[in-house]
Amino acid sequence: EIYRADVSGVVMGERGAPGELCGGASSASPIGSIEENTVRGIFGTSRTPLGTLPAMPVAAESEIRLGEATILSTVSTGGVRSYDAVITRIARSGDGGKLTLTITDGDLLAVTGGIVQGMSGSPILQNGKIVGAVTHVLVNDPTTGYGISMVTMLEAAS
């Protein structure tokens, strides 16, 4: 089942030791259910609206470019914030689009050291469109991680 959650702290990532977001469920009632957890995404059903952020257009894989990007994540009690990143590699294969990204945002680096466990699913934005989501941190370099394209996730969901 899916529950609303609050972030209560961060264990900062460092070389060889991925950090993590600490927190817990903020309500006793589930807001949805998970039906499938795959390499292409977690799929389920929501019983209530999941947030107040506006819908965004999805970038075609051909629109994803190397260079500046933004991730949206909640790493403190302040709620969702945008953080600067750079897409450094795009691998298109039969498995779909896979992205490599590096966090460049000073605020995020100061709090988390980069990408930490618990940030999976954080949207990756570029040129006003959602291009994908964070999936993994590179353990030997927490400033760097991987993502999956939104098109790949949507294809898997259909």
Predicted regions mapped to residue ranges:
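C-terminal recognition in membrane/secretory proteostasis and scaffolding
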Residues: 1-158
